[in-house]
Regions:
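Pyridoxal 5′-phosphate
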Residues: 1-220
Length: 220
C-alpha cells in the first residue's frame, strides 16, 4: 500500500518462499516477483522465473535472437519474449516443471510441515549451547525452514568447512546474498552458517548435525 501510494514498484524476492508457502501476486498486489528454481521448488540449478504485472515496463538486460519475429531487426518488445533473449534453458525448465508437478502432488503444506519440524528440532538442539548465536525469530508461525547461526568468533567459512570435511554436512556460509542484513547484524566480516532443511532429510540426520555443532562448540 505504501509503495502504491508513493508510486514505487513493489518488488518481491521469493527465493526462500516459492514452493514453501502459497503466493498470490494479485492478493499481495505485487508489481514484480522473482524466484529461483533450485530451493523450495526443488528444481535444477540455473532455473528461476520473473512475474511482471501487466503494465509494468522493464528494460531488457540482454538483447539478441529469440526465434520469434526473426525478420525484425529490433529486439522483440512483447512480453515475455522481450526478456528471453537467446536459447532458453529448455531441459532446466522441463526439470523445474517436473519438480513443480511433484510439489503439487505431494502438497506444499505436507512438505513444509516436515521441514519446519526438522528445523525446530535442530534449533532446539543448538540454541542453548554456549557460544552459539542463532539469528531470526523462531516464534513466528510463518518462516522458512532455515537456521542461521555463528559459533563464537569463528569465521563462518571455517565452521562450514569443518562440518563438511569432518562430518559430511553441507551448509552455506558467508553473506547469503543479503549484505544489508549482515550489516544490520554486525556480521559483515564473520558471515554466518546456514542450515537449510528439506523434507528429504531425516530426524537422524538432524541429530547428527546437532552432535556435530556440540562437538565444535566444545572445541571452541
Amino acid at each position: 500500500q505504501i509503495a502504491s501510494e508513493k508510486h514505487i514498484l513493489f518488488v518481491v524476492d521469493a527465493s526462500q518462499t516459492a514452493g514453501v508457502y502459497p503466493i498470490d501476486v494479485q492478493e499481495l498486489e505485487v508489481d514484480v516477483l522473482c524466484f529461483t528454481g533450485h530451493k523450495g521448488l526443488l528444481g535444477p540449478q540455473g532455473t528461476g522465473g520473473l512475474y511482471v504485472r501487466e503494465g509494468v515496463e522493464i528494460r531488457p538486460l540482454l538483447c539478441g535472437g529469440s526465434g520469434v519475429d526473426t525478420y525484425n531487426m529490433h529486439h522483440p518488445s512483447q512480453m515475455p519474449t522481450a526478456l528471453e533473449a537467446g536459447t532458453l534453458n529448455g531441459h532446466g525448465i522441463a526439470g523445474l516443471g517436473a519438480a513443480i508437478d511433484y510439489l503439487n502432488r505431494t502438497g506444499i503444506d505436507v512438505i513444509r510441515e516436515k521441514e519446519l519440524h526438522l528445523m525446530r528440532r535442530f534449533y532446539d538442539g543448538i540454541s542453548q549451547l554456549p557460544d552459539v548465536k542463532v539469528y531470526g525469530d523462531f516464534t513466528a508461525e510463518e518462516r522458512a525452514p532455515i537456521v542461521t547461526f555463528n559459533l563464537g568468533d569463528y569465521d563462518s567459512s571455517e565452521v562450514s568447512d569443518e562440518l563438511n570435511e569432518v562430518y559430511g554436512i553441507a551448509t552455506r556460509p558467508g553473506a547469503h546474498c543479503a549484505p544489508l542484513m549482515h550489516e544490520a547484524l554486525g556480521t559483515v566480516e564473520q558471515g554466518a552458517v546456514r542450515f537449510s532443511f528439506s523434507h528429504y532429510n531425516t530426524e537422524e540426520e538432524v541429530d547428527t548435525a546437532i552432535r556435530a555443532i556440540c562437538e565444535l562448540a566444545e572445541e571452541e
